[in-house]
């Protein structure tokens, strides 16, 4: 399974810059996108489908903010949206896909750059994510975590 993880910083802007042309030439089975800043309805998904991709979107409730998506040529057995952590789930930060014995998690970790409240939220999110991942590790040995980790000491 070949996987690409890519923070697009807005899927609509990426499309304007040739994202679909790039998709036609890449050899990946699975493409995990972070910071999509859009819903599925904001994108011409017929182009994805014509290239053989199944697509799964988890968007933030706040329009134009955050969000993750996975485009895959391999149909997953199961898709789970979110982790059950409400604040995180409202921001569309985690999507999980199961492929036979492999569990893939695409995550957009929060940044703490916009002040103390967001830094506190980030630490809480990291604690919740760690608990979530530890639970998953007990259920499967083949766990792939990809995404934008936004990890820097002061961010």
What are these regions (language model features)?
Residues 11-15, 85-89, 127:
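Short gly/ser/thr-rich secondary-structure transition/capping motifs
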Residues 12, 77, 152:
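Nucleotide phosphate-binding site architecture
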Residues 84-85, 110-126:
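Surface-exposed cleft-lining segments at the edges of enzyme active sites
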Residues 119-140:
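A long, amphipathic alpha-helix that forms part
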Residues 36-37, 44-112:
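Structured beta-strand-rich core segments of catalytic domains in phosphoester-bond hydrolases
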Residues 7, 23-41, 104, 133-155:
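Active-site beta-strand/loop signature of hydrolases that rely on acidic residues for catalysis
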Residues 1-50, 54, 65-66, 81:
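N-terminal, active-site-proximal structural segment of metallo-dependent hydrolase catalytic domains
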Residues 1-9, 101-113, 146:
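Active-site-proximal beta-strand elements of phosphoester/diester hydrolases
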């Amino acid at each position: 399974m070949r996987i690409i993880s890519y923070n697009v910083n807005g899927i609509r802007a990426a499309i304007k810059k040739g994202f679909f042309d790039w998709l036609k030439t890449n050899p990946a089975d699975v493409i995990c996108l972070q910071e999509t800043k859009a819903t599925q309805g904001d994108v011409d998904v017929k182009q994805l489908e014509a290239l053989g991709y199944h697509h799964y979107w988890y968007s933030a409730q706040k329009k134009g903010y955050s969000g993750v998506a996975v485009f895959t040529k391999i149909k997953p057995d199961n898709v789970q949206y979110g982790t059950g952590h409400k604040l995180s789930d409202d921001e569309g930060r985690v999507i999980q896909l199961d492929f036979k014995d492999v569990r893939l998690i695409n995550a957009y970790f929060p940044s703490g750059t916009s002040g103390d409240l967001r830094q506190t939220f980030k630490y809480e999110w990291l604690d919740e994510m760690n608990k979530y991942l530890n639970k998953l590790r007990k259920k499967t040995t083949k766990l792939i975590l990809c995404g934008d980790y936004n990890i820097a000491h002061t961010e």
